[in-house]
Amino acid sequence: MTAFVPDFGKAGGLVPAIAQDADTGEVLMMAWMNAEAFEMTLKTGEAHYFSRSRGRLWHKGGTSGHTQHIRAVRLDCDSDTILLLVEQRGGAACHEGYRSCFYREMKDGEVSICSPKVFDPKEVYK
């Protein structure tokens, strides 16, 4: 079996982690993971990330209840990017209330909202 350990040494201890809906293939979000976040994700079966702005680990959905249940974890060929195939519980991955953090789209020079808004952040993050 091939080693399954991200290379956290390439970028100062952090690697990008992409969360993708395991059923639909929709890209939900990108966040950062350090070794501790990766270990907690594997241990608990729910996504944990590292917040660069707060300088600490965070459990996705710990405040909102919009957790990400891990179905599978993949590493890219260089072991410096993580892909999480998830079941998005609660309906939204984005702290702005949208299903996906990639909710804005530019097509033919026009910008539009392309992901449904699931909740009002003012009501969830009081």
From Swiss-Prot:
GO terms for molecular function: magnesium ion binding; phosphoribosyl-AMP cyclohydrolase activity; zinc ion binding. It comes from the Bacteria. Its main location: cytoplasm. It is an enzyme of class 3 (hydrolase). Mg(2+) binds at D76, D78, D80. It catalyses: 1-(5-phospho-beta-D-ribosyl)-5'-AMP + H2O = 1-(5-phospho-beta-D-ribosyl)-5-[(5-phospho-beta-D-ribosylamino)methylideneamino]imidazole-4-carboxamide. Its EC number is 3.5.4.19. Keywords: Amino-acid biosynthesis, Cytoplasm, Histidine biosynthesis, Hydrolase, Magnesium, Metal-binding, Zinc. The keyword tRNA-binding does not apply. Gene3D superfamilies: 4.10.80.70, Phosphoribosyl-AMP cyclohydrolase. Binds 1 Mg(2+) ion per subunit. Zn(2+) binds at C77, C94, C101. Homodimer. NCBIfam families: PRK00051.1. Catalyzes the hydrolysis of the adenine ring of phosphoribosyl-AMP. This is Phosphoribosyl-AMP cyclohydrolase. The gene is hisI.
